[in-house]
Swiss-Prot record:
The keyword Zinc does not apply. Gene3D superfamilies: Ribosomal protein L13 (3.90.1180.10). This is Large ribosomal subunit protein uL13. CDD domains: Ribosomal_L13 (cd00392). PANTHER family: LARGE RIBOSOMAL SUBUNIT PROTEIN UL13M, RIBOSOMAL PROTEIN L13. This protein is one of the early assembly proteins of the 50S ribosomal subunit, although it is not seen to bind rRNA by itself. It is important during the early stages of 50S assembly. It comes from Chlorobaculum tepidum (strain ATCC 49652 / DSM 12025 / NBRC 103806 / TLS). SUPFAM superfamilies: Ribosomal protein L13. It holds the Pfam family Ribosomal_L13. Keywords: Ribonucleoprotein, Ribosomal protein. It comes from the Bacteria. Part of the 50S ribosomal subunit. GO terms for biological process: negative regulation of translation; translation. One of its GO terms (molecular function) is mRNA binding.
Amino acid sequence: MSKTLSFKTYSAKPGEVKRTWHIIDAENQVLGRMAAQIANVLRGKHKPQFTPHIDTGDFVVVTNAAKVALSGKKRDDKTYFSHSHYPGGVRIDSVKDLLQKKPEKVIEHAVWGMLPHNNLGRQLFKKLKVYAGPEHPHAAQMPVEMKINQ
């Protein structure tokens, strides 16, 4: 008798997932390209065990967020719009101001836009750690350096 082939789709279980820590130096990295790769690692799309409805991704630490590069004239022209839901509660922040005050928010905003906007996306987003300078408190996790494809 011949062996029968199994055509069952593999679905990862939350307990089976092996998570690693990655570190990215954002200095002179283009924001959008870097954010796309970070989102893929957070989701786990770089692993063969990727399952869309399960958190199979890894942790990502981003350093030097204040030195991120923006292509074109985005550093001067790009703005972020938010509203407090009160009359006159419009708030418009430019990237230039945010990079001076809270440079972490620029990378977090870009990555959040590339993750699913549901409970799973919020869970994935918690695995992103962004720091303005080169120091980070995650040395004990032994993060692996990750290169960004340009």
